[in-house]
Design a protein with these regions (language model features):
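Gly/Lys-enriched N-terminal cap/neck module of very large, oligomeric protein machines
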Residues: 4-7, 11-162
Length: 162
């Protein structure tokens, strides 16, 4: 579960931190208030592509920009962290994506609990963290295998794929 999202120097957000509590969270606001920026930031944090040329995507400002997400640990995440030799002392998972601008170049770094990781590792851990389904997208709300698991669990019988 996502417990906090921090943005620094990302489009409208000079410095902003959202804290999420257990339960259902709704993000509402007028057009242009930054809702899409929040979701795009979360996507980029978890391995999504950042396009600096598109006005629909995040635009980086200042010399340094940062997106940081804090997540509760579950057993799957703990196992992943153990397999990748990443410490998890406090029961939380902290993912950080940082951009620095030097000599007309953009240097990006991603970290999990302070350890530098690559995009492949971020994409590997993404399904264990969050599943965002946006308006008009219904192709992957629940995978077929998971649907069958719940049906089997409700009926006490195994349903086979045809």
């Amino acid at each position: 579960m996502l417990t906090a999202l921090k943005l620094k120097n990302i489009v409208l957000f000079e410095s902003n931190e959202l804290v999420f509590k257990k339960g259902f969270t709704t993000i509402t606001g007028e057009s242009g208030s930054g809702k899409s920026i929040l979701f795009k930031s979360l996507d980029v944090l978890l391995g999504g592509q950042l396009s600096l040329s598109s006005s629909k995507n995040i635009q980086i400002g200042n010399d340094k920009s940062l997106i940081e997400g804090t997540f509760c640990l579950n057993n799957s995440l703990k196992n992943w962290l153990i397999d990748h030799e990443i410490d998890f002392d406090n029961g939380e998972l902290l993912i950080t994506k940082e951009w620095r601008f030097r000599e007309n170049k953009i240097i990006t770094r991603s970290r999990i609990n302070g350890v530098m990781v690559n995009r492949k590792q971020i994409l590997e851990i993404r399904p264990l963290l969050i599943d965002v389904t946006s308006q008009g997208v219904s192709n992957k709300i629940i995978p077929t295998e998971e649907k069958l698991f719940y049906i089997d669990k409700l009926t006490d019988k195994t349903i086979e794929n045809l």
